[in-house]
UniProtKB/Swiss-Prot annotation:
InterPro entries attached to this UniProt entry: V_ATPase_D
Pfam families assigned: ATP-synt_D
Protein's name in the database: V-type ATP synthase subunit D
Lineage, broadest ranks: Bacteria, Pseudomonadati, Myxococcota, Myxococcia, Myxococcales
Gene it is expressed from: atpD
Family: Belongs to the V-ATPase D subunit family.
């Protein structure tokens, strides 16, 4: 830290900087509390989403196994090729206390039987159910992915905010307090020296006046 001049203006400057640092730490703590609340809420959503994804995937795998047994591997592979498609994703960024957090959005992924690139009659009931369950699993997966991206970003920002709070409270504020104390002690010592000099001056003044009155 740059050494501040040992003056009353310097003391006011250091105290002002300490006040700003203290207010900054309080604001950062408030920010961290908001982010922590958002993190806790999002964590519960992600855990619930993962449980839902596990449930949906188990159903999808079971439905696919049944479709393979009833309709055959080749028939399923043929209709699956015609059902292939690209899924357009929209990635946007929103801010929570100034923290940019990504969000992923996709259109509805579960399609009707006649929207999978071939005649509905090409699909057996088991194959149709397997396709629907896998499309549902993809929808759930994308929702979780968006929330997990948000969760990771919030965690990073909370850590960064904690580091800034620690720097202010453990480094900046103690240094400013020490500097303020140094200047204040120096000014008090200077004031005491001025008082002593003034007393000496006043003590010598009568003697000088008496000497001046002598013939």
């Amino acid at each position: 830290m740059t050494r501040t001049p040992t003056t009353r203006m310097g003391l006011l400057e250091v105290r002002g900087r300490a006040d700003v640092a203290s207010k900054g730490a309080r604001l950062l703590r408030a920010k961290r509390e908001v982010l922590a609340g958002e993190l806790w809420k999002l964590t519960r959503e992600v855990l619930a989403g993962r449980a839902r994804l596990d449930e949906v995937l188990r159903g999808a795998v079971k439905a696919l196994g049944l479709a393979r047994a009833l309709e055959g591997e080749e028939a399923l592979a043929s209709v699956a090729l015609t059902a292939a498609r690209e899924v357009p994703l929209q990635v946007s960024v929103r801010r929570v206390w100034g923290v940019p957090t990504p969000s992923v959005a996709a259109p509805a992924l579960i399609r009707a039987a006649d929207e999978r690139g071939s005649s509905p009659t090409s699909w057996g009931l088991a194959g149709t159910e397997a396709a629907r369950r896998h499309e549902e699993a993809l929808e759930v997966l994308l929702r979780i992915a968006s929330r997990e991206l948000h969760l990771a970003r919030l965690g990073e920002e909370i850590q960064a905010t904690s580091r800034r709070i620690n720097a202010l409270e453990q480094l900046v504020l103690p240094a400013l307090t020490a500097e303020s104390g140094r200047i204040e002690a120096a000014l008090e010592e200077r004031d005491r020296e001025d008082v002593v000099r003034l007393k000496r001056f006043r003590a010598r003044r009568p003697r000088r006046e008496a000497s001046a009155r002598r013939p």
